[in-house]
């Protein structure tokens, strides 16, 4: 484990363990090295960095994860979301950890309580682990602290500080809170590359259809051409339009609130899927 780094820079109010967040990024960097070694057929390097990554992950979970409660560290938003985003959480505990994260967001009135590291992780951590409704409410929030609060107060760039009245850390053109832009493509449009088929040769489609949002469209220019993921709500169903570029294929994975098939393989071309929505239970 390591405590090197600046930690969750410019948080709203809650402070996260720097050892937890820095160690997660130590793991991420080690995984990158392992994957690169595999690509370049550096077998010994691949074995070394894979073993090191596994050792780091186990050390993080041994020290910070309460397996009974599904809480990392003190359970604040960043400490729950960063391990989810970067693949630290054991598979069988992902939904429990995500539910705890959603509870934290709900308790904050669907407002952020994160700095730079949590802002990178929180929307993905929610929407990719069964909590897309909470992710959307968080992304659509327009009162302090939120991305929308900046817009409501006239900002046209990404700021360095959630607090518009801050007297330090006040850059008016700072990319560090910018993950929400990518999340629109991933969390709502569901457009992901397939790690086994780089460059969008094969496309993974994992859109979410949160209540309160009736239509959405994302277009992405891949090396093979434009990918389009567009959906609209029609009473008790979603009409989902997909464009798969030439020489590519795709697999659509249905979110939890859709009835029927969980995965559909799609060839190149334009497709329309009629997706019945499950009735919400409160």
State the predicted function of each range.
Residues 77, 116, 129, 174-178:
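Alpha-helix initiation and capping sites
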Residues 37, 51, 133-282:
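Non-catalytic C-terminal accessory modules of carbohydrate-active enzymes
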Residues 10, 67, 106, 110, ...:
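Generic preference for well-ordered secondary structure
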Residues 1-54, 58-112, 116-124:
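The feature captures the catalytic groove of carbohydrate-active enzymes
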């Amino acid at each position: 484990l390591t405590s090197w780094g600046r930690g969750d820079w410019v948080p709203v109010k809650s402070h996260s363990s720097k050892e937890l967040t820095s160690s997660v990024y130590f793991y991420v960097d080690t995984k990158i090295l392992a994957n690169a070694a595999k690509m370049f057929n550096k077998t010994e390097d691949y074995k070394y960095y894979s073993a090191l990554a596994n050792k780091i992950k186990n050390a993080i979970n041994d020290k910070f994860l309460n397996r009974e409660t599904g809480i990392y560290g003190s359970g604040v938003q960043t400490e729950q979301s960063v391990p989810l985003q970067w693949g630290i959480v054991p598979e069988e505990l992902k939904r429990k950890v995500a539910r705890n994260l959603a509870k934290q967001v709900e308790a904050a009135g669907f407002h952020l309580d994160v700095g730079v590291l949590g802002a990178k992780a929180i929307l993905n951590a929610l929407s990719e682990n069964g909590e897309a409704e909470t992710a959307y409410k968080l992304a659509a929030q327009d009162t302090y602290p939120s991305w929308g609060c900046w817009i409501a107060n006239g900002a046209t760039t990404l700021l360095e500080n959630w607090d518009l009245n801050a007297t330090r850390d006040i850059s008016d053109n700072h990319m560090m809170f910018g993950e929400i832009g990518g999340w629109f493509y991933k969390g709502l449009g569901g457009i992901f590359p397939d790690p086994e088929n780089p460059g969008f040769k094969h496309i993974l489609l994992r859109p979410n259809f949160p209540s309160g949002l009736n239509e959405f469209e994302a277009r992405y220019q891949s090396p093979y051409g434009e990918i389009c993921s567009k959906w609209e709500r029609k009473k008790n169903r979603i009409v989902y339009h997909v464009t798969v570029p030439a020489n590519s294929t795709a697999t659509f994975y249905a979110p939890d609130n859709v009835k029927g098939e969980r995965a559909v393989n799609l060839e190149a071309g334009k497709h329309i899927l009629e997706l019945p929505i499950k009735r919400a239970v409160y």
